[in-house]
Each structure stands twice: as structure tokens, then as C-alpha cells.
Amino acid sequence: VIDMVGTRRATDYGKQFCADFLRDLAVLCPDVLVVSGLAYGIDIHAHQAALANHLPTVAVLAHGLDRIYPYVHRKTAIDMLAQGGLLTEFLTGANPDKHNFVSRNRIVAGMSDATIVVESAAKGGSLITAELAEGYHRDCFAVPGRVTDESSIGCNRLIRDNKAALIQSAEEFV
């Protein structure tokens, strides 16, 4: 089980990494489960790349099962029901409140053997997930980026501070 997380403002670089990594991982480890949070950005691209490569994928939601947030990800969520599923600790009617996202990240990190941070600014939920993964003694990886890119600051710091191993491909991950 791996989780792929990152910024909600994914760049083409991050989107392409998700697509290429999961395409290659599907060949090397066809039974791997991909977990993320169904959010904008890296999360949704990870789910969609998993589906495109026939990998099971699970979204951990920050609200009840009676809604999909963001609503524009409803089709992907429905597709995931046949190839993974949706998971939440929140009761029906629970709203996607800010504190629920941090709680959701705890489950994402806890159910995964490895966390992969694809892109992250200096602050964000994906860095919280990486910190939680470290606390759970899980493997953590980060995709390096250009030092001038805001969306790479968090990943580069994780690597620099030895909080995550540098990852460039599925082959070296396996």
C-alpha cells in the first residue's frame, strides 16, 4: 500500500510524475494499492493514474460518505468504487471542515507502507502526511524539483533534512 500526496496546485511536472510512476509501478507491482485524499491537484491525479493503469485506489475522505468533495471529482469517486473504494471516519452529514483534512491525513499515512510526496510548497497537508508517516515508522519518499519552484520547496526540504528519500522512478522505488 502506497499513498501519493502533494499540492492542490499541481504542475505539469507533478501530474506527469504521477502518470509515469503509476504506469511503471503497475507493471512492476500490479497488486499495489494507491491511497490518497481525492483533493484537487496531486491527489486526484494519483487516483486517476491508478484507475488508468488498473491499480486499485482508495480515497480517504475528510467528510461523510453522503457527499463527494470537491464535487467535480464525483466521476472519479464513482469509478473508484469498482476498483478500490472510499473510506472515512466521519459520520453521514459531516462537512469537509479544515480540521477534518488533518485527521484524514493521519489515516492516509497510517494505512500505507510508504508515503510519496510528489510536490509540496513550504507548508501544506502533504508535509503533515509525511511527518505522520515518519512517526508511524513508514517509508517516506519525495520527488525532487527545481529549487526555484514554489511547488518543490517542501519536497526538496524533506530530502535535504533526511525526512524522505529522493525518488525519481518506479524502478528505483521497487
What label would you give each PLM region?
Residues 1-174:
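Glycine-biased, small-residue-rich flexible motifs in mid-sequence functional cores and linkers
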